């Protein structure tokens, strides 16, 4: 059964019809139910895919009525229409016909897949891709299948019968002749040139004009850069009705005619000195007269059949690499359609490009098919997750299915252009991994929500702890030399209210030391957050973090790493959100730090002031602490950077290697770390401090890069700047106003609560009561009684006087006195432990515990920057806080 491939008007059958025909001639049993079914269902496609490149195409060219169809019918057992000389002589074949060679003819032997594989071994690297394990698995399976089916796999042969040239019907129009020649050269392994022996040596009678056209067309194909020299087709020149004894003279004449035609063709520079053998494999064969030597003719037909079918024959025609351009049989309809369309539209036919287009088309189909199958598979697990089902080892199941899909893709496309296959394989792998990650992310986000609910309070407390450490360090940071003491002594001779502001403004801050404290704050915050992240990544997983997902995480390393990525990113954003909220209310944050530093000692204990001078001494240090807080708020210095593959995070205690699946590699690529690491520009992007009279200097001279700029560009990141220069100045001014207001209220409260006797009372008591004083001093019993009464009833008075002396006295006297008291207390305390001392000690310890609880409650109450997810807290008014502390002290 033959197919009219190209009709007389130059119309090629549709791609669908070509596929139906090929399916019919390859596996007739598949198409018994109807030709439409074979084109639509998968049986026909799988049948064509099974052939692969194990087939050949043979075409014939020659003059009109020269016996081309007759030769093909005898040689390949086809049923092409032949000339009926009793009716007329004229054109019989119009356009081009296709048929399958009859394998049952004598001399046609089966060619096993193993033989084909041996012939294609030299080009195997160009047809298959070994990009990954899937390709290797596909190749292994195909080799095994070939070994089992070698004995029953026959080499398919397709025969093309082209319209004869020099016919009366076409006249002098050679356009269609040239199109058919180009079409034949683009698809056939071997072209048979049918010539009459009596026409050898003639130009027109031998139809050598056809040879000239074929030479020019093939030269056009070879002019492309990507065309491979090994793919040159075979020209089999058959001399018909040869009656001489020695064919050598005739063959020499044919070769000379070919060389003459070749020399007369205008050739490109790369073929200027080349012979015709650079473009063709030339083979010659002579056949006896068809009518006069019928028996000899049939014998020569059988001999020529072995040239096409017997791989052991010395003249076997398919031993070179051409092998039909490397186009698999299932891609033949698309390839024929593409080539003929390019020829008919007078486009420059580039066979390598056509092969690439065919490979792209086939690879795209295979990719979409495998991707659709995988998405359907993954959707089932996604639905199970939506119903709350807990799936163990989900990543392993998805990775195995992904491997199956890739193996199937390579098996379908292994015979196409390796570069195109590799490109689409990478695209398929990327989309498969994306689909896998969508399912894993759904599971991982549910687990990450559980982890975040348990880990988030610790991270937020880390911010508060780092801020407390910053305030503690800033509170004890000394001012620049020569400023503090002189200013403090000068305050004694001035008015109390006016002197407080002067004292604070006179202090000069140590700017490098303050910047160092800011760096320490961010370094400490980074360390605290990474401790939480390390605990999330620890193996075995912690039950207090993962809750009910502990068993799942322990069995699925890929999901655990993915959860770690989500948690790390979420904690980073949570810390940044917290710092942004603190920067938005920078004045309140600074004032809260000022109050804490003013009302607490560096060791965290509560502090009360008995004199205004003591308060004035503490105000500069407290003010400095708040200003340092401002330096920590105006720029966010933590970074989320890619983590190194060998950092060890995610490995268990036994040192088990991390998973190496495709989804695991994607998860590792998305891993990040939180760290504090200033670049050169950020190292200079700090506030510069001088005195309290002026706001800190903003680093406006440091370049700032926008968020869309390259990360390698030097400069501070614009999206990390939390406070602009104007916002920094405004926050500082409001902070100073609040500090001054709080200080003045505290000073007035201290002044109002003083219970001071007139200066003349003490001398008067000594003068008027001198006799009584001597009597008491000389009477031991009475002296002891007076001391006990004073210790019991005037203890608070003496303590307040000592605090006043401690705050106002010179340091040269206060420090030695405190040292002596501490030494005596150390010596006497062991002696008192045997008496009622333990009760007193327990009482003091209970007072200390109560003070610690009160301190913690005060810290929580003064924080106004609680994250929205944790609720809201209001800062108590400063005056009320100070009055409460003062009144409690005085009572």
Curated annotation (Swiss-Prot):
UniProt xrefs under CDD domains: GBP (cd01851)
Intervals, Cytoplasmic compartment: 1-756, 802-891
Keyword terms: Endoplasmic reticulum, GTP-binding, Hydrolase, Membrane, Nucleotide-binding, Transmembrane, Transmembrane helix
Segments passing through the bilayer: 757-777, 781-801
One GO CC term on file: endoplasmic reticulum
Family listed: Belongs to the TRAFAC class dynamin-like GTPase superfamily. GB1/RHD3 GTPase family. RHD3 subfamily.
Lumenal side: 778-780
Annotated organism of origin: Leishmania major
Residues in coiled coil: none
Function: Probable GTP-binding protein that may be involved in cell development.
Domain (GB1/RHD3-type G) ranges: 52-321
HAMAP family, per the entry: Sey1
E.C. no: 3.6.5.-
Designated name of the protein: Protein SEY1 homolog
